[in-house]
Amino acid sequence: IAENFLYPKDFESLIYISQVLQAIAIKSGVEHWRRNRGRCMGAIYWQLNDNWPVASWASIDYFGRWKALQYFSRHFYADVLGSLKVSEDAVYTPYLQNETMQEVSSDVTVFVKNMLGEVLWKNSQRAVCEPLSVKAMGPVSLKDVIEGRESEVFVEAVFTHSDGTLSRQVEMPKPYKHMQIKKAEITFDVMIEGDLLTVRLKSDAPAFFVSVESN
């Protein structure tokens, strides 16, 4: 934890950030293996759930409550996934992974944003991916864009897929503990329509790893 985040101030924070770190680690692994389709044909993480109340690496606890990893897995196991390969010298390569039987296309925009969410730079491209395959898009070199302000900016990639789904990736140039992240003020609205309850969050600055709890 201390390699990536400021050390938690209390036990509750320690529990939370440990789950976040687990989710990031497994997400990174699964997306890497999916990008290497042909060499690696699948990835299953251990473990899904617990059969007794215990502190464990399960993504769903004994009571059926989702941990961070379970929420992350809905995205990194999506049939159509956009991910980012980060190489040395700040080269970011978007990848499109297609696990369906139909051809898909995707429009991706790579942004460099500051910690207020303002766009400092962007690049857009489009790719088509055959069924059951992976497509590497054009690499994007951001060295000249982020050099000297690695603690002040982050990279975001937004993929809009032809099947109507969306992938979003965020990468920090440095570990989170070195990033000058602003304290965000988050507000929310709750809307009820019949049996459907919708919670909408609004933040005045980028807010990472936000969770919602309700009684």
Kindly give the residue locations of the regions a language model identified.
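Hydrophobic, well-ordered secondary-structure elements that form the walls
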Residues: 43, 94, 157, 201, ...
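Short loop/turn segments at connectors of secondary-structure elements within structured domains
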Residues: 39, 102-106, 121, 149-151, ...
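Short, contiguous acidic/charged loop-to-helix segments that flank catalytic cores in large enzymes
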Residues: 13-18, 60-61, 126-132, 145, ...
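Surface beta-strand/loop "capping" patches
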Residues: 74-110, 177-203
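Intrinsically disordered, low-complexity Ser/Thr/Gly-rich stretches
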Residues: 181, 206-215
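Substrate-binding clefts and catalytic carboxylate motifs of secreted carbohydrate-active enzymes
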Residues: 1-104
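Intrinsically disordered, low-complexity Pro/Gly/Ser/Thr-rich segments with frequent PxxP/GP/PP motifs
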Residues: 107-149, 215
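Terminal connector regions
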Residues: 111, 136-184
